[in-house]
């Protein structure tokens, strides 16, 4: 088993080396792709846009992003995936040969296990939701037209172009091996496809959101404690990241498994609070919500305020405080974009004339 994995990892190292040597001019592009593919953009950019354009799509997008990333965490704890940037330095596979030179970048040194790729899984799930939802909106109940078929081809070509760029980016940056990004894409699509058949998320009560959040958090912590009790160190990757990362400042605590867990459950709990609040019912369920200028205003204000909010980084000196603040910050994102911002704008704009609806 280990010998087979070493061969697979060596193929990944050679792939990374090939990309870094032959596509040096694309370095900035691959870094940009990796930054854009971060799941944070699904929460801070894509969610407020889709929620105020098509509420059901926004809700499904957030559920897919959260549950997909939670499953990604569990998979990583089970699979114990290596990362190229530390494996190439840590392995004795190259004992009788020269070690391939692998460059590191500011976004390379993530601290969690590597399989499956979180960037690939998150992007695949979120973009799958957007593509399938867009196609369902334009198709209607009639027989597909020529224009619809063209749109179908264009959107799916765009989808796979995005996935290819994300996968190549993660390999180029030495953050993942090829088999890890492929596993991420397939897993993300599977999660998104599953949520196409789940209707209960659109009218879930606050109690249901609370219990699901509690289950996700307690299961992950319980699973961690169980494996730890069996002698398995699930934070083994943190030591490797700190040891083999080229620069200490490139190792960020917000990429640890528990940071990801708290962000996800915080986001889902915040969505539950927002959708079951009186501010949401007054602003997003009345006649004003049908007025396009109002919805557009909600999108613009949400994007601006969430961008400013995202720039506020919780202090990371004390891990417990960092995790608690990460949970609160994540919960505030859907709470602001779903209820607080629309409520305030509704008070400012007032009720529109019926002719303008």
From Swiss-Prot:
Instruction: Output the Gene Ontology terms for molecular function.
Output: glucose-6-phosphatase activity; phosphate ion binding; phosphotransferase activity, alcohol group as acceptor
Keyword Transmembrane attached: yes
- Keywords on record: Endoplasmic reticulum, Gluconeogenesis, Glycoprotein, Hydrolase, Membrane, Transmembrane, Transmembrane helix
Could you list which ranges are Lumenal topological domains? 1-28, 82-117, 169-170, 231-254, 313-320
* Record topology, Cytoplasmic segments: 50-60, 139-147, 192-209, 276-291, 342-357
Report which reactions are catalysed by this protein. Answer: D-glucose 6-phosphate + H2O = D-glucose + phosphate
EC number assigned by the record: 3.1.3.9
**InterPro entries in UniProt:** Glucose-6-phosphatase, P_Acid_Pase_2/haloperoxi_sf, P_Acid_Pase_2/haloperoxidase
List, alphabetically, the SUPFAM superfamilies matched.
Acid phosphatase/Vanadium-dependent haloperoxidase
- Quote the record's binding site residues for substrate: 83, 170
One GO cellular component assignment for this chain's record is:
endoplasmic reticulum membrane
> Which residues are reported to be glycosylated?
96
> Per the UniProt entry, what are the Gene Ontology biological process annotations, in alphabetical order?
cholesterol homeostasis; gluconeogenesis; glucose 6-phosphate metabolic process; glucose homeostasis; glucose-6-phosphate transport; glycogen catabolic process; multicellular organism growth; regulation of gene expression
Q: Where is the active site?
A: 119 (proton donor), 176 (nucleophile)
Main location class: endoplasmic reticulum
Its top-level enzyme class, in one word, is hydrolase
Question: What compartments host this protein?
Answer: Endoplasmic reticulum membrane
Query: Can you tell me where the transmembrane regions are?
Result: 29-49, 61-81, 118-138, 148-168, 171-191, 210-230, 255-275, 292-312, 321-341
Q: What does this protein do?
A: Hydrolyzes glucose-6-phosphate to glucose in the endoplasmic reticulum. Forms with the glucose-6-phosphate transporter (SLC37A4/G6PT) the complex responsible for glucose production in the terminal step of glycogenolysis and gluconeogenesis. Hence, it is the key enzyme in homeostatic regulation of blood glucose levels.
**What is the name listed in the Swiss-Prot or TrEMBL entry for this protein?**
Glucose-6-phosphatase catalytic subunit 1
Gene that specifies this protein: G6PC1
